[in-house]
Every structure is written in structure tokens, then in C-alpha cells.
């Protein structure tokens, strides 16, 4: 019985691992994790699709691929970054997600408010 449970658990872990990151097929090749498929449609002729790494801080980025899952110029941003309009003329760039820094400030603020409530209770 324990053996059957162990096998079931192992299969479940494998299924979840595969669901997390599907490899991207691009121009007949599979892209590595943390990359996307880009096909530059500008210029004299269309380039063949190629794998590119996900955007890093301040890199140009795109949010939506076309119907085939291919981006026209740039990959979306990597983990912890969001594609945000920056400067003039509002170009999209990878920026740190505002939620992360706000959350850390919020947690600091809640800690401070808890401390002040505790000090009121002990003094009052």
C-alpha cells in the first residue's frame, strides 16, 4: 500500500512539474526555460522565429504574443518584473513589480502599528 501511495505521489509531482513550464517551440526548435519566441516583422524581410531570453530590468518588452504564440520584437519580462510604459514616448520596459516593494512597505507598516498598539496596552 505504501508503495502505491509513493508511486501516485511521484506521478503527481511529475504532472505538476510539467504544467509549470511548457517548452516553447520556435522555428522548429524548442526554446529553453525563461525564453520566448520572437519573429521580427520589421525591415526588408521577415526573419525566421528565434528563441530569446525573457526581458531583464530596463529591457524593451511586449505583453501579448500573436495568435501563434510568437512575439513581434521583444519577449515579455522575466520573473519579478512587469512590462510598464516608461518615459516619452511611453516605450514598454521591464520594471520591478510595484507590488513587491509596496508589500514590503505594508508589512513594515503593519509591524509598526502592532508595536504601537502593544505599547498603548502596556502603558494604559
From Swiss-Prot:
Disordered: region residues: 93-124
Tissue: Expressed by the venom gland.
Compositionally biased spans, kind Basic and acidic residues: 93-108
Biased composition annotated in UniProt, kind: Acidic residues: 109-118
GO molecular function terms listed in the Swiss-Prot or TrEMBL record: toxin activity
Phylogenetic classification of the source organism: Eukaryota, Metazoa, Ecdysozoa, Arthropoda, Chelicerata
Gene Ontology cellular component list: extracellular region
This protein's name: U33-theraphotoxin-Cg1c
Domain notes per entry: Consists of two fundamental structural elements: a disulfide-directed beta-hairpin motif (DDH) and a disulfide-stabilized antiparallel beta-hairpin stack (DABS), which are covalently linked together.
Cell compartments where the protein resides: Secreted
Cystine residue pairs: 26-37, 31-51, 36-75, 61-83, 77-94
Keyword Signal belongs to the record: yes
Keywords: Disulfide bond, Secreted, Signal, Toxin
Entry similarity comment: Belongs to the neurotoxin 32 family.
Presence of the UniProt keyword Acyltransferase in the record: no
Domain of life: Eukaryota
Extent of the signal sequence: 1-17
Amino acid at each position: 500500500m505504501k508503495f502505491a501511495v509513493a508511486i501516485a505521489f511521484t506521478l503527481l509531482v511529475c504532472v505538476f512539474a510539467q504544467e509549470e513550464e511548457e517548452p516553447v517551440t520556435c522555428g522548429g526548435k524548442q526554446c529553453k526555460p525563461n525564453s520566448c519566441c520572437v519573429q521580427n516583422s520589421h525591415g526588408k524581410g521577415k526573419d525566421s522565429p528565434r528563441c530569446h531570453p525573457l526581458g531583464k530590468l530596463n529591457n524593451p518588452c511586449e505583453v501579448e504574443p500573436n495568435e501563434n504564440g510568437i512575439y513581434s520584437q521583444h519577449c515579455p519580462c522575466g520573473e519579478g518584473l512587469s512590462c510598464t510604459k516608461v518615459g516619452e514616448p511611453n516605450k514598454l520596459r521591464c520594471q520591478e513589480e510595484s507590488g513587491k516593494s509596496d508589500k514590503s512597505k505594508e508589512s513594515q507598516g503593519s509591524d509598526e502599528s502592532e508595536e504601537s498598539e502593544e505599547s498603548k496596552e502596556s502603558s494604559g
